[in-house]
């Protein structure tokens, strides 16, 4: 049944003006100016929860998603930790590694489960290499230590099927 809702998939919004005109572009329709009473922007991205990414161990204070850490540091002015480990080499993770360093934290490393970085090469250079932050590929967190507060994590190398390799565990405090 029709809901009367217009859906524009694969469309990038360029501007929403105060008079409710939506300037957008898509491969299929090109440039358009749409008008609407209400607009719902669905960007196609969301943070995955700890459960969705299968992080082991307990959830003590001191573990943040990239988005939460970004909000605390950039918007609220809080440093979320003095010693930082980042899991995931996406652009936000690398940008946060640099930002945390600039704010005075010691970023131990960025760990990526894949055998290749997932962010842009310029972010590897500008956010990690320029600040001496190591990037470890084919590694993941295999244990979290601490009850009330995070004390340490264990990282392990992974095989080509992304399974931890026994004997490669390293505790990072």
Which residues does each PLM region occupy?
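Residue-level signal for well-ordered alpha-helical segments
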Residues: 40, 46, 77, 87, ...
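Short glycine-/acidic-enriched loop or helix-start segments at secondary-structure transitions
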Residues: 50-52, 95-97, 146-147
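Predominant activation on well-ordered alpha-helical scaffold segments within soluble catalytic domains
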Residues: 37, 66-70, 97-98, 125, ...
